[in-house]
């Protein structure tokens, strides 16, 4: 891991139960302030970031993704990224273990979040990260995965240039718009 990238579970203790859970899918609710920045980090699990209010901008090596409240940002496991908050985002995050992420996107993308998926995400944040197979929680999480699989990827992505000089200029603009 690049020393500039943090193990997010170490720097944000509320994430540790989700990063290390036995359950294949967990969810977490976190509210942020306008302008708050989550520094570059990565997760062991894939992640669907969804703001029920506010807007998020995710920056990764391959580009920048923007998600208003009717959109979510899918990040594959291990993808280094940072997040900038706009407004006062009420973020709901779904974490998916690699073993459960089959048939889910293998690249970062913005997904549509319809009414059913939205309510499933919100309900999933009320399920403890140590839920057991076979009950209501398992059925809810299975349906949540099914709905994520069905949502289309949307073109809300700004690719980063490959040419080093242009990339350096773009990074400067992003740091100080």
Model regions: which residues?
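A short beta-strand-loop-beta hairpin characteristic of the jelly-roll/cupin
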Residues: 49-68
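Generic protein-terminus/edge-of-domain signal
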Residues: 1-55
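Short histidine-centered beta-strand/loop micro-motifs
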Residues: 36-43, 83-86, 103-106, 133
């Amino acid at each position: 891991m690049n020393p500039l990238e943090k193990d997010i579970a170490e720097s944000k203790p509320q994430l540790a139960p989700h990063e290390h859970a036995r359950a294949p899918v967990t969810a977490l609710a976190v509210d942020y302030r306008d302008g708050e920045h989550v520094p570059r980090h990565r997760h062991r699990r894939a992640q669907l970031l969804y703001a029920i209010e506010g807007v998020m901008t995710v920056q990764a090596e391959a580009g920048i993704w923007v998600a208003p409240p009717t959109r979510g940002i899918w990040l594959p496991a291990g993808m280094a990224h940072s997040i900038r908050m706009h407004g006062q985002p009420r973020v709901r995050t779904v974490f998916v273990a690699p073993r459960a992420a089959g048939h889910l996107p293998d690249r970062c993308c913005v997904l549509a979040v319809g009414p059913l998926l939205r309510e499933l995400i919100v309900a999933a944040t009320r399920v403890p990260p140590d839920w057991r197979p076979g009950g209501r929680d398992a059925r809810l999480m299975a349906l949540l995965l099914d709905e994520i699989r069905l949502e289309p990827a949307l073109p809300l992505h700004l690719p980063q240039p490959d040419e080093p000089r242009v990339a350096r200029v773009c990074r400067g603009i992003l740091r100080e718009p």
